[in-house]
């Protein structure tokens, strides 16, 4: 999988475009699962606001790809195929990994919790049958907001925080990781 260049579209995505993009991702996932009967990691960046493809989201994505590759190598799991693309919903990665789906999900949850950028990653694991393993399957609480300890979904629905504050926090986390050379 090639890392994405930083040049981004900065396209403000509409809700209908976002929904079409998600449907297209789901169709791609099913094609991949037919081609590789192993778990599929589908990876995106959590990007508040209408601009999903920016230099910041691409850099965050690239850190995530690097971390996922390192995780697979550390665990001795073979990546059978991997690809990166950019859709209306932002950067997307798919990795077919020969590993037990449950172990893979637990490892990606740990990665989301332990990596400084983990809260900005949405890492889904699909079983070879196409079932998405959820945080709820492991009795884990919902994602936390970037700015407070509330549920991210509650803050997003209630528009609790200014978009600029969320974007500034994302960029600060990214700059901290880059300054420390964390992968």
Swiss-Prot record:
Enzyme class: transferase
Taxonomic path: Bacteria, Pseudomonadati, Pseudomonadota, Gammaproteobacteria, Enterobacterales
Coiled-coil spans in chain: none
Organism (species): Escherichia coli (strain SMS-3-5 / SECEC)
Job description of the protein: Transfers 2-(5''-triphosphoribosyl)-3'-dephosphocoenzyme-A on a serine residue to the apo-acyl carrier protein (gamma chain) of the citrate lyase to yield holo-acyl carrier protein.
A GO BP annotation: prosthetic group biosynthetic process
Keywords: Nucleotidyltransferase, Transferase
Entry EC no(s): 2.7.7.61
Family, similarity comment: Belongs to the CitX family.
Pfam name, any one: CitX
Catalytic activity: apo-[citrate lyase ACP] + 2'-(5''-triphospho-alpha-D-ribosyl)-3'-dephospho-CoA = holo-[citrate lyase ACP] + diphosphate
Gene expressing this chain: citX
Record-linked NCBIfam families: citrate_citX, PRK01392.1
MF annotations from Gene Ontology: holo-citrate lyase synthase activity
Protein name: Apo-citrate lyase phosphoribosyl-dephospho-CoA transferase
Top-level taxon of the source organism: Bacteria
